[in-house]
């Protein structure tokens, strides 16, 4: 039987390099998320979703489209990850090696996505040209974020004060995407159980409901595009530890 052809959603009019010309969504919610990011009136997007839903892939894809398209007002993409090891507190200062190696250690998945979307050579060139910056929260203090996309990934491991600090850096022509999975709070646990209500991401998700210029997007277990077994595994954890936003 012939395989069903994937529907292609074309991006808005503009001169876009062929490397990121068309976005192909794998679920309806991926398409909705992509469209929300593209809304001109939306400056801050909060996205919650379990692992495997494609939230990071979609946000990076759309950001790259707008950075590479002329006349959008976005000159670069900044991708930030909190420096938290699984099951541990913030440990960036104790990592071995130089700064760039430390940053790379916490952003391996980011580099993988960049390579998948635009290729390793193009990604490396954009990093060298300053069109892509990959960093950590610790080095954002005092920085004004303008004419750029900012993606804060794994935001479930960010404190309320840290997330407030980064949001108040938003300046002109800055679009910020804060995304995370509250079921994977490595920093906030009580007796080994995730205490997601202490997370800055949980705080800001509820605090900014109904605020003009802010939009919320939530993926669910059905959006997981990994092996069907992963969905069944996730369901057992959801039944035991339900996330209530």
Regions found by a protein language model. Give the residues of each.
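Conserved helicase motor core of SF1/SF2 NTP-dependent helicases
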Residues: 2-36, 40-152, 156-245
């Amino acid at each position: 039987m012939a395989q069903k052809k994937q529907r292609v959603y074309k991006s808005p009019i503009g001169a876009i390099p062929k490397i990121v010309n068309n976005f192909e969504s794998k679920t309806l919610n991926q398409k909705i998320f992509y469209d929300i990011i593209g809304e001109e009136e939306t400056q801050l997007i909060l996205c919650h979703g379990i692992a495997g839903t494609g939230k990071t892939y979609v946000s990076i894809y759309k950001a790259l489209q707008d950075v590479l398209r002329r006349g959008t007002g976005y000159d670069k993409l900044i991708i930030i990850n909190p420096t938290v090891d699984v099951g541990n507190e913030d440990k960036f200062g104790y990592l071995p090696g130089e700064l760039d190696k430390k940053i790379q250690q916490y952003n391996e998945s980011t580099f993988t996505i960049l390579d998948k979307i635009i290729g390793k050579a193009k990604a490396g060139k954009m990093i060298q040209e300053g069109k892509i910056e990959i960093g950590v929260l610790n080095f954002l203090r005092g920085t004004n974020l303008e004419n750029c996309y900012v993606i804060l990934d794994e935001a479930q491991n960010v404190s309320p004060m840290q997330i407030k600090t980064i949001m108040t850096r938003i300046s002109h022509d800055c679009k910020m995407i804060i995304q995370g999975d509250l079921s994977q709070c490595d920093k906030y646990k009580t007796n080994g159980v995730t205490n997601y209500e202490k997370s800055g991401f949980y705080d800001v998700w509820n605090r900014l409901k109904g605020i003009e210029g802010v939009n919320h997007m939530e993926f669910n277990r059905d959006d997981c595009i990994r092996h069907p077994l992963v969905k069944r595994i996730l369901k057992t954890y959801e039944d035991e530890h339900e996330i209530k936003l």
